[in-house]
UniProtKB/Swiss-Prot annotation:
Protein family: Belongs to the DsbB family.
Transmembrane regions: 14-30, 49-64, 72-89, 146-164
Any GO BP: protein folding
GO molecular function: electron transfer activity; protein-disulfide reductase activity
One Gene Ontology CC term in the entry: plasma membrane
Source organism of this protein record: Idiomarina loihiensis (strain ATCC BAA-735 / DSM 15497 / L2-TR)
Cytoplasmic topological segments: 1-13, 65-71, 165-181
Entry keyword Signal: no
InterPro entries (alphabetical): DiS_bond_form_DsbB/BdbC (IPR003752), Disulphide_bond_form_DsbB (IPR022920), DsbB (IPR050183), DsbB-like_sf (IPR023380)
Membrane topology: Multi-pass membrane protein
Name this polypeptide is given: Disulfide bond formation protein B
């Protein structure tokens, strides 16, 4: 019987999270390289949040048997999802504001001096696009709208998994049961 509370103990669950993040980054690069949609600063920050979730998944994948690495992975997942949600929602709000004058953002990503990612890997982290431009839509939502939905989903799943993991850690039950045979 597989329970949500036991997911952090299973490398396969972390692998699925990593593959999901890899798919999101692959889609971002497809939009950038193939469709020629230039990312803006907020897009790059959202990309970093996805990378943060992916790195947390790698920590969980290789350290799911150890409680410290498992909790570091869960916290990294929750933190990166939350930050990504804030940035994506702010970007979405900026694009849908009535006054286009305020639909601007920084001209270059604000990375730490010790890790200028946009200088080290400009193909991935440079931000020549404008935050207010809506160059792509699907089902009425632009890229920031979809990323808001994705980050909200990742955060919600992360919260549920973490709560179930806490409950299953303090009880003899397996946590929230997904199915019965």
């Amino acid at each position: 019987m597989l329970s949500v509370g036991q997911w952090p103990n299973k490398p396969f669950a972390w692998l699925l999270l990593f593959l999901g993040c890899s798919g999101l980054l692959g889609a971002a690069l497809y939009f950038q390289m193939v469709l020629n949609l230039e990312p803006c600063v907020k897009c790059v920050y959202q990309r970093m949040a996805v990378i943060g979730i992916g790195l947390s998944a790698i920590v969980g994948l290789f350290g799911s048997g150890l409680w410290l690495t498992r909790w570091a992975a869960l916290i990294g997942w929750l933190y990166s999802s939350y930050q990504g949600l804030l940035i994506a929602y702010d970007h979405w709000d900026l694009q849908t504001s009535k006054n286009a004058f305020f639909a601007v953002c920084e001209s270059a990503p604000n990375f730490p001096d010790w890790a200028p990612m946009h200088e080290w890997m400009p193909g991935l982290f440079a931000a020549p696009g404008l935050c207010g431009d809506i160059d792509w839509q699907w089902l009425g939502l632009g890229m920031p709208g979809w990323m808001t939905v994705i980050f909200a989903g990742l955060l919600l799943i992360g919260i549920i998994v973490t709560i179930c993991h806490i409950i299953s850690s303090f009880t003899k039950k397996d946590g929230l049961v997904l199915y019965h045979k």
